[in-house]
């Protein structure tokens, strides 16, 4: 097999599956010590996990459940079942008065008979973490909480959230309700990507409704050094203190999930440590461009002498900043040589990415053009040159 050096990765100007983790990079920096039940730091662009602890442990999500509630609402808007301007009449089961389920919990402070838009109920769900807003939306979209929970679990299955099962629309403690830091990072990534109508609400610092002003409980929104613009907090006695925070640093976005911290300040500090570590130590680079040439090879017995090779896919990847000078890309042909005729987009080898001497990723190498069979004269000439 022939191996060709393409270029150092520092000169590349990649979408990788979320199954690829930073641990695949042999020389990843030491992650921070995190004091929580479980945690994840994910790169938004690639879905790569940069560091994690107990990431698939099933835990009580508390109000992080509302991320899925909001996701289902947005899917209903996307499918034109509802619009953000639809007016919802609040029913009795969404009114906290004389409702033991809501005692001591987060509320938007809706009243039975209130007429509220889907947009404002979504703000109440996101900013106030209003359990009453969740119920009002569930009743309007699905005709009841039980039916809405079924929709939530259907979407969890579609998103391959294997550690997740919902029993409520709001996240109050319920037997059988659980998720994981990994699943919630995947869900958060889907929300950021697929909710342009509502994602900006996650950065709103306060909401006034029925004369009551409440602040967003995500304290990192006030940290001017972090550029955090979401997502959500959660807390119950059974869950501890949970937080998902997403921050933008230049063109990069990271998602930090902390579950089971010991206090509201503690969850913020642990998320802050994760985000800063990710921002300081990693960079997101495009390794390969679809259709861009990575090499040229001699082709025998064709109507031309050389053929361009590349990839059919876009590849992004998160790499440790300190390792960029040591990243090399090479390609290997499957056989000793290429012979015509050959079609475009045909696999002829493999592109390999190395960190120092360790292979960290690989992708198919394909032809970027077709080469037909040459004339009798050119094939005869190639024969003698080839055998020489």
From Swiss-Prot:
Substrate binds at residue 232. One of its GO terms (biological process) is cell wall organization. It is a peripheral membrane protein. It is an enzyme of class 3 (hydrolase). InterPro entries: Beta-lactam/transpept-like, Peniciliin-bd_prot_C_sf, Peptidase_S11, Peptidase_S11_C, Peptidase_S11_C_sf, Peptidase_S11_N. Residues 1-21 form the signal peptide. GO terms for cellular component: plasma membrane. This is D-alanyl-D-alanine carboxypeptidase DacD. It comes from Escherichia coli (strain K12).
